Amino acid sequence: MNKGKITVSDIVSAEKILGIEYSKQEREQMMNDLEDQIISAKTRRKSKFDNNVPTASKFDPRLPGFEMSNLTGLKISEKTYKCPSSDEDIAFASVAAQGHWIKTKQITSRRLTEIYLDRINKFQGQLNCYANVTVELALAEADAMDLLTEDYISLGPLHGIPYGLKDLFDTKDIETAWGAEPYKNRLPLKDAEIVKRLRAAGAVLLGKTAVGALAYNDIWYGGRTKNPWNLNEGSSGSSAGSASATAGGLCSFAIGTETLGSITSPSERCGTTGLRPTFGRVSRSGCMALCWSLDKIGPICRSVEDTGLILSIINGYDENDRFSIKAPFNFNSAKATDDLKVGYIPDAFGADATELDKDILRIVSNLGLDLQAVALDNLPYSSLINILHAEAAASFEDLTLSNEDDNLTWQDNEAWPNSFRKARFLSAVDHVQLDRLRYLVMKAMDDLFNDIDILIGPFDVGPMLVASNFSGHPCLHLRVGFESLPTRTRIKSEKIDPKKKFKVPRGLSIWGALFEEEKILNFGLALEAQLNIADQRPTFAR
């Protein structure tokens, strides 16, 4: 037998991996032709693609007949805030309040920036939430905003507001390593589109927040990012540093990304308010691509209103993002919620839900809203995750084929290196069939929101986390209470004392129809006011 020749036994082994079975005659018939397929694949692999090269196929969450609203505008509360004397109170204040203080000259952008830089210096060792702190740049940008303020010039609600940026976004001449060892010392030549938009709005860059390596989990080349409410556990990810820094009062707000839970999961863990916009609403130009048909960008804040304010700045079409969609954004924080139809899936509040989850239904009923039990079509939603694995493995094919993935810190079974390797055995035929299943999921989600305005539920119970990410629907996640839980971990070697418990946040996810973020924001505002717990802070910061 010639070395390298495909044999019948090779095909039999492959059948086991793919979960299929051929006859002896079928195996013999395909044996020689398989070698041509292998040669073709190897030839293609000689072509190396930069991470910013997109796919030819283009995901669009809109089904035929979709009508885009043409409403646009931003109206937030016009409260007058008095600047407190405590640096901690200033640090944990909302973006809206801080913006008012700067505009009315109760505080300078430089002073606000210095407060955060001091807190980063004090608490970074505990939280490990920043990959890179841009001290000189932050102070220079703050001083520039103060000069404008002195001349009564304001660039808008983010004028002089310091923020953290997930280390997936290119920043000119500032290391952007994607949390991964192979990309350390990577210096982009230009800024990502979102950086340009935030700078034009007057926001001040404090630094690059830590990201789980290649946008997964909370483990990166600098260690593990921690949850401010329990420093023994990770912050979850992959927007690990963005959620941790925001929850810990180490920035006014932060920018995160989500492919499958990377805004909502750390927001759940750290008690922040995270907004995952509709797919295509926010430009990803200059952001690391993990999954072209799934990646989304959104704000992580300490209040609902702030997320809407920031989305109004970063929203907008960008011709440099092949998947970008022209979509106006309208947000009036004073808009009434009386006519909202709120849906819930009963099974999501069943045996796997916490008592706090179930109590939320009573609280929503007390708001006087139309609460309806609904059902999502019975489809194999979890199967869609193989689309994510295939796209992610394609994004970082070179790491797998060169064995550089061995240099990544996290090497457990569920970590990227193993997932990338396994993905090489996914069937292209199954991948196409998954794309067809995805279309059915899009239709199921569209049908769901024909009858309701918003859907509520625990983010980690039921099919909605997967279904909504693959359909492109928006989600707001906010804190609704606290639980007493032992330390949570995904590290198999880590030993945990199950008897030692900590007060940690519990959140709720609020999903909406495509491009209708205003409805979930207004509902979130009403719920936030009813619960009155948004101002509670982690004890480590006192």
Regions found by a protein language model. Name each.
Residues 76-81, 276-358, 402, 529-542:
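A short helix-breaking turn/cap at a secondary-structure junction
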Residues 88-92, 124, 160, 172-175, ...:
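Gly/Ser-rich, acidic/histidine-flanked active-site/gating loops
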Residues 190-314, 458, 469, 473-481, ...:
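Short glycine/serine-rich loop segments
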Residues 106, 111-117, 143-147, 332, ...:
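Acyltransferase
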Residues 70, 105, 160, 200, ...:
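Glycine-rich, small-residue loops and helix-cap segments
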Residues 22-260, 362-363:
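Gly/Ser-rich catalytic/binding loops embedded in alpha/beta enzyme cores
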Residues 76-89, 158-178, 336-345, 386-442, ...:
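Short helix-loop capping/hinge segments that flank enzyme active sites or metal/cofactor-binding pockets
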